[in-house]
Amino acid sequence: MYAVVRLRGQVNVRYTIEDTMKMLRLHKVNHCVFVPENPHYKGMVQKVKDYVAYGKIDAKTLAEVLENRGRLEGDTRLTEEYIRENTDYDSIQAFAEAVIEGKSSLKDIPKLKPVFRLHPPRKGHAGIKRTVQQGGVLGNHDENINVLLHKMR
């Protein structure tokens, strides 16, 4: 599962890239979505790589994002009780592990908003005009996306 975080704004962005961002539900800066690893989403993420950071997320980080930034309709927080009542899992951590293994999906939580509004990273970005290979934060982070998401918790 990929975590995709929008890091750059929408001024002077080509129409096709902005349209792809809308399809990914990344309308604003510091918004995050989780998408499955399939060729369709991989192509979409590759198209917007100069405006987002993405990588493979682990269960611990997914649980942290769900707990801190997970919101239900009506802007209420996602809680352990809600997970227990509405899914087959006892905790957010157990649910996150099932999602990473592919046994479950984020859509299994009723009324969960698909977009996570993150905080700007503590201690700042390394630079939003450069890719990871050049010393910035844009593009493919692989496993290091977990570090960025922890900074943006």
Swiss-Prot record:
SUPFAM superfamilies associated with the record: Ribosomal protein L30p/L7e (SSF55129)
GO MF annotations, alphabetized: RNA binding; structural constituent of ribosome
Keywords: Ribonucleoprotein, Ribosomal protein
Gene (name only): rpl30
Subunit structure: Part of the 50S ribosomal subunit.
PANTHER family: 60S RIBOSOMAL PROTEIN L7, LARGE RIBOSOMAL SUBUNIT PROTEIN UL30
Gene3D superfamilies for this protein: 1.10.15.30, Ribosomal protein L30, ferredoxin-like fold domain
Keyword Ribosomal protein: yes
InterPro entries, A to Z: Ribo_uL30_ferredoxin-like_sf (IPR036919), Ribosomal_uL30 (IPR039699), Ribosomal_uL30_arc (IPR005997), Ribosomal_uL30_CS (IPR018038), Ribosomal_uL30_euk_arc (IPR035808), Ribosomal_uL30_ferredoxin-like (IPR016082)
GO biological-process terms attached to the record: maturation of LSU-rRNA from tricistronic rRNA transcript (SSU-rRNA, 5.8S rRNA, LSU-rRNA); translation
Pfam families cross-referenced by the UniProt entry: Ribosomal_L30 (PF00327)
The organism's place on the tree of life at top rank: Archaea
GO (cellular component) term, any one: cytosolic large ribosomal subunit
Protein name as it appears in the record: Large ribosomal subunit protein uL30
Similarity comment: family membership: Belongs to the universal ribosomal protein uL30 family.
